[in-house]
Swiss-Prot record:
This protein's name: Ribonuclease HIII
UniProt KW Hydrolase keyword: yes
GO cellular component: cytoplasm; ribonuclease H2 complex
Subcellular localization: Cytoplasm
Keyword annotations from UniProtKB, A to Z: Cytoplasm, Endonuclease, Hydrolase, Magnesium, Metal-binding, Nuclease
Location of the RNase H type-2 domain: 90-306
Top-rank taxon, per record: Bacteria
Classification via SUPFAM superfamilies: Ribonuclease H-like
NCBIfam families: rnhC
Function: Endonuclease that specifically degrades the RNA of RNA-DNA hybrids.
Co-factor remark: Manganese or magnesium. Binds 1 divalent metal ion per monomer in the absence of substrate. May bind a second metal ion after substrate binding.
Family: Belongs to the RNase HII family. RnhC subfamily.
Originating gene: rnhC
Catalytic activity: Endonucleolytic cleavage to 5'-phosphomonoester
Organism encoding this protein: Staphylococcus saprophyticus subsp. saprophyticus (strain ATCC 15305 / DSM 20229 / NCIMB 8711 / NCTC 7292 / S-41)
């Protein structure tokens, strides 16, 4: 099956939607309209990108968008420095996490599978290292990716996180268990005979990861660990965007629930916010929405004590 993606202007989209009927209700998040035309699925996204999927996708795209430059699959190898494997030339599962360095909010982990046919689509959509993307862009991209990329998203809420930490689990162990579980879930959704590599954004040495993962690694001989993996594998970049999306949406809901802006990270601003929450709702509530072992907790308590002792 061929996949073609174009970035359109509002005028282009209006012209396209005037040529054939589109469905504009009961759509996936991030989608503006969809239809099926002569066996080709056509999806228009809020980002003004349109995706044609089907064996005749290229011909249908050329027919309906005659004035738009044709997307061409790239056969050029990705440039590498120290990297020895050009992962984007292969079919990979990538995994990454979000929230591990944030006092507030959960730990989210995602594994995502990117096939040959989807590499160019992800590039056309603008999939990149999530650290380079705004939260708004992450939400926009993730809501498109989850509609067609096989993936598994796991969320460890603060109650479970604090329970495991109290039981002696390090954060590295938590991440290893979640990464391994997410990867296993994805292998059950794809034809693994077509899988070339499993690429994990490295947060621990391979031996440590394997020791902490609690169960055997699926396809251990195909598993690789890469530092700064998002820039080396588009599968990791996709997983990173989806895991970050889940974290961002959780933080948005938390902000609405607490009725105050909940900052990300572990800065002095976080200490001040935590102190305000202690005053308003108590330390137990703070623990229910945060990672209890972070130093921010003690700093917030000190701020509250100082306020009432001065």
């Amino acid at each position: 099956m061929t996949n073609i993606v174009h970035k359109l202007t509002n005028s282009d989209i209006q012209q396209l939607m005037s040529k054939i009927p589109f469905e504009t209700s009961q759509l996936s998040q991030g989608m503006k309209a969809k239809t099926k035309y002569k066996g080709t699925s056509i999806s228009i996204y809020n980002s003004n990108k349109v995706m044609f999927q089907g064996k005749d996708a290229e011909r249908i795209a050329a027919q309906l968008l005659p004035n738009v430059t044709k997307s061409q699959p790239s056969s050029k190898k990705a440039s590498t420095t120290k990297q020895t494997i050009s992962y984007n030339q292969f079919q990979c599962i990538g995994s990454d996490e979000a929230g591990s360095g944030d006092y507030f909010g959960p730990l989210t982990v995602c594994a995502a599978y990117v096939s040959h046919k989807n590499v160019q689509i992800l590039k056309a959509l603008g999939v990149d290292d999530s650290k380079k993307l705004t939260d708004t862009k992450i939400v926009e991209l993730a809501e498109q990716l989850v509609t067609f990329i096989p993936h598994s998203l796991l969320v460890m809420n603060n109650e479970k996180y604090n329970e495991k930490q109290k039981a002696g689990w390090s954060q590295v162990k938590m991440k290893a268990v979640l990464h391994n579980e997410a990867i296993k879930n994805v292998t059950q959704k794809i034809d693994t005979t077509e899988l070339d590599y499993i690429v994990i954004d490295q947060f621990a040495e391979a031996g440590v990861y394997k020791r902490y993962a609690l169960s055997d690694l699926p396809f251990s001989n195909k598993t690789k660990f890469e530092t700064k993996g998002e820039s080396k594998s588009i599968a990791i970049a996709a997983a990173s965007i989806i895991s970050r999306y889940a974290f961002v949406k959780h933080m948005d809901r938390l902000t609405q629930s607490v009725k105050t802006d909940i900052p990300k990270g572990a800065s002095n601003k976080v200490d001040l916010t935590a102190a305000k929450i202690i005053e308003r709702k108590g330390i137990a509530y703070l623990d229910s929405i945060s990672k209890k072992h972070f130093a921010n907790r003690k700093k917030a308590e000190n701020l509250v004590q100082k306020k009432y002792n001065d």
